[in-house]
From Swiss-Prot:
Processing and modification events after translation: Ubiquitinated; mediated by SIAH1 or SIAH2 and leading to its subsequent proteasomal degradation. Phosphorylated by SRC.
Broad class of the protein's primary localization: membrane
Transmembrane segments: 26-49, 108-131, 139-162, 201-224
UniProt keyword Transmembrane helix present: yes
SS bonds (residue pairs): none
UniProt protein name: Synaptophysin
Signal peptide feature range: none
GO cellular component, one term: synaptic vesicle membrane
Localization in the cell: Cytoplasmic vesicle, Secretory vesicle, Synaptic vesicle membrane; Synapse, Synaptosome
Function: Possibly involved in structural functions as organizing other membrane components or in targeting the vesicles to the plasma membrane. Involved in the regulation of short-term and long-term synaptic plasticity.
Residue ranges constituting the MARVEL domain according to the UniProt record: 21-228
Gene name of this polypeptide: Syp
Family: Belongs to the synaptophysin/synaptobrevin family.
Region ranges (Disordered): 239-314
Organism: Mus musculus (Mouse)
Length: 314
């Protein structure tokens, strides 16, 4: 019964989750951050390396032809030692490696682990607590600040670990170790390197560190848009103002029926001359025209209601 109740709770959470956010840039980048953080701390924190060298003494019976030296994370190399023949009366000497590079390595792994945990928590919040996340806009603002902090921490930790890795390679190079071995400086003794440590996994961890830096810096923009702070910068440009008619244009100050320049009625051919009949007045001179004594009627066209001569004949 308890198992069934737990399954019901899980089903309710899954049903109420907004998994579409994983397809959006905000959620998809969080998934990438989560995965890349795992690769970053796994490739560094689980590393174990080994180098091999040989010491051939003048007295062949005292030689050690296959000396194996193992080291691992967190690279406190000053605590790593191996026994090498002193080439004097069958004795041995403890040889310690040089350097302590645990600070940069542990800092890098710590940032990766916390980034992994934060990405997982933020992704769960996006899916199951979307309303709480957007309530009062506090969720996006806190998310933005945390993303900015992690981006800075990835920059610092990746740079520090890249320098630390370079020092680890120098300290575990068999040639450099041989230079510090007193028996190898004695005449008649021969020291050789047999195998360099494989550091490809550590190189990969540095690459993942800077990839995480790119992801977290890029995600700043998507989280910034969720805060609403970008709204004033994303407004549409204002529309162009309407063009006002210039004074004197058509339908403007001198509009229809408002004198010269408009479209009001004017005398035929203008006031300067030309043929200008007035259909409402008698024709001058008593002769022709369209007045009362014309051929087509007894009165001009200006007098409405008067029958024409044609209508009288009808």
């Amino acid at each position: 019964m308890l198992l069934l109740a737990d399954m019901d709770v899980v089903n309710q959470l899954v049903a109420g989750g907004q998994f579409r956010v994983v397809k959006e840039p905000l959620g998809f980048v969080k998934v990438l951050q989560w995965v890349f953080a795992i690769f970053a701390f796994a490739t560094c924190g689980s590393y174990t390396g080994e180098l091999r060298l040989s010491v051939e003494c003048a007295n062949k019976t005292e030689s050690a032809l296959n000396i194996e030296v193992e080291f691992e994370y967190p690279f406190r190399l000053h605590q790593v030692y191996f026994d090498a023949p002193s080439c004097v009366k069958g004795g041995t000497t403890k040889i310690f490696l040089v350097g302590d590079y645990s600070s940069s390595a542990e800092f890098f792994v710590t940032v990766a682990v916390f980034a992994f945990l934060y990405s997982m928590g933020a992704l769960a919040t996006y899916i199951f607590l979307q309303n709480k996340y957007r309530e009062n806009n506090k969720g996006p603002m806190m998310d933005f600040l945390a993303t900015a902090v992690f981006a800075f921490m990835w920059l610092v930790s990746s740079s520090a670990w890249a320098k630390g890795l370079s020092d680890v390679k120098m300290a575990t190079d068999p040639e450099n170790i041989i230079k510090e071995m007193p028996m190898c400086r004695q005449t008649g003794n021969t020291c050789k390197e047999l195998r360099d440590p494989v550091t490809s996994g550590l190189n990969t961890s540095v690459v993942f560190g800077f990839l995480n830096l790119v992801l977290w810096v890029g995600n700043l923009w998507f989280v910034f848009k969720e805060t609403g702070w970008a709204a004033p910068f994303m407004r549409a440009p204002p529309g162009a103002p309407e063009k006002q008619p210039a004074p004197g244009d058509a339908y403007g100050d001198a509009g229809y029926g408002q004198g010269p320049g408009g479209y009001g009625p004017q005398d035929s051919y203008g006031p300067q001359g030309g043929y200008q009949p007035d259909y409402g007045q008698p024709a001058s001179g008593g002769g022709g025209g369209y007045g009362p004594q014309g051929d087509y009627g007894q009165q001009g066209y200006g007098q409405q209601g008067a029958p024409t001569s044609f209508s009288n004949q009808m």
